[in-house]
A protein has these predicted regions:
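Paired acidic/hydrophobic, glycine-rich loop segments that form the ligand-binding mouth/hinge
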Residues: 63-69
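Short amphipathic alpha-helical coupling segments at ligand-binding clamshell hinges
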Residues: 104-115
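Ligand-binding "clamshell"
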Residues: 40, 60-62, 74-88
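Solvent-exposed loop/turn segments at secondary-structure junctions
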Residues: 23-27, 71-75, 102-105
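Bilobed "Venus flytrap"/periplasmic-binding protein-like clamshell domains
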Residues: 1-55, 122, 135-140
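Acidic/histidine-rich, surface-exposed loop or edge segments in extracytoplasmic proteins
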Residues: 91-97, 121-125
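Extracellular/periplasmic juxtamembrane helices and adjacent flexible linkers that interface
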Residues: 113-149
Length: 149
């Protein structure tokens, strides 16, 4: 079975071990308990793995799947597949431009709308990886992004 969604993951949860930050595992309202209430079956096992240790945990086979922020550079570095949250358990990372009314000219609003439409979670993750993993200057990354608009 190819895993594409959280629903797919829930269907095999009883057979796999989930790695996640200890705080997520213990969070009753937005962590493991809430996920199980929302999507279904319990996992065969869980193991606490903090974000900075996911790469090592993958190499060691500590768990079968991991809870990771979609913008974490480990996603690109380890070539992780992000599953679709098909029931919207967790809102996506979103960039929103806020303007005060006096400066919100139609041209500025249109420009910010174009930027916002291009700043997808995947694109943000790529830019963060370029900065964090490759050491590229954030200004260089930002300018390269703006050049694509």
């Amino acid at each position: 079975m190819q895993l594409l969604t959280y629903t797919n993951l829930a269907s095999i949860a009883p057979d796999i071990t989930l790695g996640a930050p200890a705080s997520w595992l213990a969070n009753d309202t937005a962590g493991l308990a809430a996920f199980v209430d929302y999507y279904g079956p319990e996992f065969d096992g869980t193991v606490a793995v903090e974000s900075d240790a996911i790469g090592d945990a993958i190499d060691q086979g500590t768990a079968d799947c991991f809870v990771v922020d979609s913008l974490d550079p480990v996603v690109a570095r380890e070539r992780l597949t992000l599953l679709l949250d098909d029931k919207v358990f967790v809102p996506s990372n979103t960039v929103i431009a806020l303007l005060s009314e006096p400066v919100a000219t139609p041209d500025l609003v249109a420009t910010l709308d174009a930027i916002g439409a291009s700043l997808t979670t995947q694109r943000l993750a790529q830019m963060l990886n370029e900065i964090n993993a490759n050491g590229t200057d954030p200004i260089v990354v930002a300018n390269a992004f703006l050049d694509t608009l």
